[in-house]
């Protein structure tokens, strides 16, 4: 059917209005992000203080498993496995934040540029597949970002043991100064922890730092044998 000039004009106008509305939505989305606290400039390095880090309180069963664990057993690092959560946030390697509409990406240059994908604005986790860094959703409580993480890979270590897949982490992240970041975490796992493990870390911003490439496998001199065990005896010296 042949359209009239008026019909074609109306169709073009509707298309232009729809495109303008979509562009306005995109612009509004980025304007919203621009109004959030500035986590994204530069990189963050932990202001590490081992004395401020409380030790987790383990269940009796977890204590027994830890005692029976071979002292020479290697950690995930010997086979270049990810540390998972909360391990990714522990070693003190520099991190960077990247916000986009509906998501936050946290990148660490610890090894192979580890990435956490945090979904912003979601109300629930749904039914996610297990992942080394888990499934994270977040919302803003004023100027504090509240992150909730579940579905962590059962092999991800927690207090020296495989977590078993029942770890739940709640984080509160906020700026305490122009170049200071506070990161409060509460880790729960009824199979390993006798009580929630709460700790706070502080980070300092380095505005001129950049993400660096790192590779665990490259240059690795402790490759596993046929059974997957490390060749080097990691038993602590007496």
List each model region and its residues.
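Bacterial N-terminal signal peptides
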Residues: 9-19
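Bacterial N-terminal signal peptides that target proteins for export
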Residues: 1-10
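Hydrophobic small-molecule pocket/channel-lining residues, especially in calycin-type beta-barrels
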Residues: 21-238
């Amino acid at each position: 059917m042949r359209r009239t000039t008026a019909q074609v004009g109306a169709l073009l106008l509707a298309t232009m209005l729809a495109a303008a509305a979509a562009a306005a939505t995109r612009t509004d989305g980025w304007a919203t992000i621009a109004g959030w606290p500035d986590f994204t400039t530069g990189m963050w390095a932990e202001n590490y203080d081992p004395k401020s880090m409380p030790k987790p309180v383990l269940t009796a069963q977890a204590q027994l498993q830890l005692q029976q664990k071979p002292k020479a057993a290697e950690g995930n690092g010997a086979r270049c496995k990810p540390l998972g959560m909360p391990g990714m946030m522990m070693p003190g390697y520099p991190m960077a934040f990247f916000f986009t509409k509906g998501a936050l990406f946290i990148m660490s240059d610890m090894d192979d540029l580890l990435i956490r994908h945090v979904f912003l604005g979601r109300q629930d986790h749904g039914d996610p597949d297990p992942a080394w860094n888990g499934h994270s959703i977040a919302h803003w409580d004023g100027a504090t970002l509240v992150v909730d993480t579940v579905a962590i890979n059962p092999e991800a270590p927690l207090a020296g043991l495989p977590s078993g897949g029942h770890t739940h982490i709640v984080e509160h992240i906020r700026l305490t100064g122009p170049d200071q970041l506070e990161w409060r975490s509460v880790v729960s796992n009824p199979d390993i922890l006798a009580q929630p493990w709460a700790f706070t870390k502080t980070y300092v911003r380095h505005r001129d730092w950049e993400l660096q490439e790192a590779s665990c496998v490259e240059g690795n001199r402790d490759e596993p044998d046929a059974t997957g065990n490390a060749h080097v005896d990691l038993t602590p010296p007496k």
